[in-house]
Amino acid sequence: MTQNRTHTCGELRLSDAGKAIKICGWLENLREVGSELAFAVVRDFYGTTQVVAETADMVALLKSINKESTISVEGTVRERDSKNAKLPTGEIEVVPGKIEVLGRCQHNELPFPINRSREADEATRLKYRYLDLRNPAVKNNIILRCQVVAALRQAMTEHGFLEITTPILTASSPEGARDYLVPARNHPGKFYALPQAPQQFKQLLMTSGFDRYFQIAPCFRDEDARADRSPGEFYQLDMEMAFASQDDVFAVLEDVLPPIFAKYGKYDRASSAPFMRIPYTEAMEKYGSDKPDLRIDLTVQDVTGLLGSCGFGPFEGNVVKAVVVSDFHETRKFIDKTLADVEVVSGGKPYWFRLDENGEIVGGIAKFVQPIKESVVSALGLKLSLIHISEPTRLRRIS
């Protein structure tokens, strides 16, 4: 394989029994059975291999090596007496003739167990990132990213797009966030900016006659961290098409994205083509957002006809919108906090009521709803343990 190893730690099989081999990796675990018998697990990028030391000298050598030290093992492959069907290498083990320490781990105790690194706090994981990345679960995320990017490149190329890398150091062109600035050494007092997106460059390409462009583009924005991205930078599939309509762009993405999500997605929830089209007005009226998360089955309903004339002052002369929440079993404290949060975000004061276990309207504005209970229950499909949150808004038109 290479001059330093003949096989990887995930490669050996029963058909290799009797072969003289050399593997390299990290000492993952050591189990001592006695002074002349010990089992070690050596791990590399590709998997793990069990090493069996059967002499006092070899056991003593393994005991002197701290876990996660880098070692090489030269020995002979043999069939295991006790096989592990859960491992690709579970039918074999290696009897070492020589073990060499290539890089010694200086500490007996690690900052966290490798296979549980995600349980450690973020600062510790980042400080010992080289250990965190040895966790198979973390490593597999990096591999998944590589596979998705490769699939995107292949799909875009098949659709006639050229991958063109655009400049990183550029002039400032504010696009909604703050720029990252880089001092220009030869021009004191002047700065380069890191691009928030390659917008101007891809437009330049189109005016230059290039027909279809894409890249896995780094974007830099000096903004606070979010739950789904690191502070400052992220990567996106950036694309541009000449002489194209909105539907032309949709058609490309409907071909490119569903197969990738179907192949690499954790859940089988990839949208099939054609993608659902939601007009802006409908999105705002039904979901209260121009980018609704359709996985959340909570829609806004216009109940002005039901509650606009129920006698409750704030509803009179206003549009009344409602959200029905099913399987609701929270405390009054939770309801009050939620409504307070909604008021801060929306600027309007929300009200609530629910159908209790006896089928009665209770809570909030219940006394105004009780006289029209049957109409409300029928129109909104209310069932026991459903909470109904209503909010008046001024009459307005969305165009």
What residue ranges belong to the model's regions?
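Class II aminoacyl-tRNA synthetase catalytic cores and aaRS-like
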Residues: 1-390, 394
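N-terminal low-complexity segments that are often proline-rich with Ser/Thr-Pro
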Residues: 395-399
